Every structure is written in structure tokens, then in C-alpha cells.
Amino acid sequence: MPRRPRHTTIVASLLAAACLGAGGGAVAYATLHDSGTNTVVRQVTVQQADTASASPLSVNQIYRRAYRGVVEITVTEGGSASPVPGGGQQQAQGSGWVYDSDGHIVTNDHVVDGSTSIKVRFWDGKTYSATVVGTDKSTDLAVIKVDAPSSELFPLTVGDSTQLQVGDGVVAIGSPFGLEETVTSGIVSALHRAIQGMTNFTINDSIQTDAAINHGNSGGPLLNTQGQVVGVNAQIKSDSGGNEGVGFSIPSATVKTVASQLIANGKAVHAYLGVSIDSSAPNALLADIQANTPAAKAGLKKGDVITAVNSTSIATGDDLSRAIDAHKPGDKVSVTYKRGGSEHTVTVTLGTRPN
């Protein structure tokens, strides 16, 4: 079962904290993030570089280019309403990285979820309080903000995750188990993985890597061989609870879209079809239709098999989620499906994914 790597300890309690896990379900929910409302907040932090012709940097060169832009995040949870017996507070640590020179920092939603206070430690050991700008549970992303001087802020360059290839070198920087500025390296093991966010909605096109990712790495950057952020480290798949060489990062293409919305509006909107897919089926078989959703209003029913969205062929539930992911709320899409041996096509107006 996938686990989200956030290092957790208990303050004023003898209980050991449990690691956060990404729950699995019998069905996968077909939704999408809104890729059509991207607002660039700080153009300088989203540089488009021609990495195809650039020579790869060494791990040390990547580290020296990026380490000042990576932060350690310590959150305090609980208090008088704490679920910990005795009302003790729980502290947890994760990672993050500087997104722009306004002090915005990108991390995972599960790092800051439920926090009553957030402290950010920078490369020089200085610590600042942070506030939550916005969170998006369905993509497990969050933006927080610190009021720090410009001399403290070293925004990382965001690369293009769509240009990654299997076998490309990658580097992770973060604070596993509270060990700040830890560097691990590996390769892109696979692309286009579908992982689960903090809800049942899937995060499409996630990056699988064998670079060591452990508890505390959550929210830290995955960097390409040019030192550009191509992912946000989010989950590991492990039977032991530790690194086994199967980690997952949220792609930078998703990060740019969601982060810009969170900074501009405090929330991110995602298109929504309103169906669940039978994950045991070899195709995009509808296991359920949520009431009063775009799919229900268009007449789709349980047992229908989706075969196309517009001109995109659909063979699996992941294909359907990815196809919807290419649109935004309010878009009209043509959905082709099979029912009882006959093929039908219906126009669906996509809605907005519920929280």
C-alpha cells in the first residue's frame, strides 16, 4: 500500500505516531485537475530551458544549484482538541521548496494538513513562521508563505516533466527523518503512474523513481539533471514502511497548474465527470455514477464501457482520467460508450470536482 513519507514524532505523549498511508479502493475515480486556468505568478521561477541539448550536471552540481531553495517544514498539530490521549500536541516534519521570490513555498497537502502552526527552516538554519495560502487534497499539493527577506529566498526553476524519459537521472533533496539537506539520486523508473491523492481522486502522470524517498521527504523536490524541479516527492510503496526503491512524485506539469491557482485564488478547481471505474476490469467499465453529476445528467449508467472522449481512445480507467484531465470545468466533451453491444455517443458538460 502506498505510504506518504512524512516523519512524525509525538510531543507530550508516550504514543508512537502512525505513518500516513494512501488508501486503496475497489474503484478508481475519474476526475481531473484544471489545466486550462494556469496563471503564472512569477515568470522568473518557471523558466523554460532546453535541456535536450544541455550536458547533464553531476549530483554535486545539482545539489549546489538547488540546496538553498529547499526547506524543512515542521508542523504542530492538535492541542486541546488533539486526538492524542492527554491532549498532547503532535509534531511532524516534511520538506518543501521555494516557488517564487514572494515567499511562496510548495509542499504536500498531507504535510500541513491539520496544522496549528508551521515553521520553515532555511538552508542557513534560520526559521520563519508560515501561513497556508491554499491546499488541494485531490492532488496532495499545498502552498504556504513566509515573510522572509529576499536574501533568504532562492526560488527553484520548474522544469518540464513531460520531457522526462524512463532511465533519466533524477535527484531528491529533503529532510528524511529530520536530516535536512539530504540528497539521494536515482533514475526515472516509470512514467504515467496513477497514484491516489488525499481523496479517492487519482493524480495522473506521476513519476516513479528509485531515488531513496523516506519519511520527511514529502513535499521536497525531485530534480532533473539540470537541477530543475520535475516533481514533488509524495509517496512510497513499501511493505516495511521504509524506502524500497519505489517512490512517486507529483509531476511538475501538475504542480505549476495547481500552485498558480492556489496562489491566485486559495484553491484549485478541477473538472469532474462523476463516475467511478471498476479497477478489476480490463477496460473503462463504469462501476458507479454519482447522483446529479455531469455523467448522470448525460444519461451514462453503471455497466457502460467508455471507449473514447472526443477523439481520444479510452482503453482503461487511467486513460479516462487522463483524458478528462486535459479539460477544465464547463468544457463540453463527446463521450463514446458501449451499452448492451451497441455504441453510443453523448455530449457531457464537465462540472467542478467537489471537495
PLM-predicted stretches and their roles:
Residues R3-P282, Q290-N292, A298, G317-D331, ...:
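Serine-dependent protease modules
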Residues K332-S334, T345:
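Short, conserved beta-strand segments of beta-strand-rich sandwich/propeller modules, principally
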Residues V309-I314, G340:
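Short strand-turn-strand beta-turns centered on an Asx-Gly dipeptide
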Residues G303:
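Conserved catalytic motifs of ABC-family nucleotide-binding domains
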